[in-house]
Amino acid sequence: MRPLLQSGRRAGFTLIELIVVMGLMAMLFGIGVGMLTALNPGKRAALGLVQNMLRSARNNAVARSAPARVRLDPASGEIVAMGMDVLGTWQFETLGLDGSSGDDGVCTGGVLLDDGFLGKALSFEGAPAGSHAEVALQENPSFDLREGFMLQCALKLESPDGGRALDVGRAAGIECRSNGSLRAWFRPQVTSASGVASSGGIVAVDSEPGVWRAGYWMRVEVTYDRRILRLALDGVEVARAASAEPVWKIEAPLMIGDARAPFPGAIDALSIYAVVDSGKAVLPRAVSFAPDVPREIVFSADGSLDRELFSAPLSIGLEYEDGAKARVIVNVYGTVE
């Protein structure tokens, strides 16, 4: 007879082993929950969200050398970063007026100068009546200047008589006056008591007489951010005016020169920017803004807080559902902490 083999031990845990394993798992799980609670990713996410939106606006201000802003809505928890974005540039290397955005133009009577501000330039000096250039911007919906804009160009006049250099679809423009002054203007949108929007009278700024001379290139910049209309010549502000109105829509072509009286000079390096939403975000449901948060944070062209509005660092408070609080600090140089 063959001896009976003793059956092998079945695989598995004894009761004691099972209790020990469950105890270890419970201990590890408890430690993990504690660590996650301490980390609180929801709170960190809300804090990082606000910081990132502020940094995005500041970076835009520095990159474009133009003001940028962040709007905070305590009621909805919405954060909107707004800054300048280039809509189109024209370098006038050909009479086809090739635009960077595909918005090419038509030139009547103008000629190209080889010694422009940057490369070639478009000139109407000595051109016959009716000479001008135009680009049909009113057909491009992306050219929306409602929240603000920036116009940059180089001008060189050959006559002290001056003339109209630029008219952006009857919404904004630049003029050179015969007394040597510069004028920048825009047309605001006004809304009646019944809610009907229409074009208002122009808002304009004029420099002191004698800021420009015939025969020299000058760099002209006009900036409007629904707070200040600024006019700068060769990097120096020469005029400003306060306004908070939105800009009226572009409803006609961009006109370079004047069909009635040709511009007595040349233009080069034209760029048009508009204020656009560069980012939007909403705080998580369990987080809200503190009641004392500023509704708008404005960064200057150099990235610092606008010194006309803020003389000290800004504190933006966040309040959490569990009663905890946190703050984001923006110092006077625009650094977000």
Residue ranges and their predicted role:
Residues 2, 9-36:
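N-terminal single-pass transmembrane signal-anchor helix
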Residues 241-266:
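Flexible glycan-contacting loops in extracellular carbohydrate-active proteins
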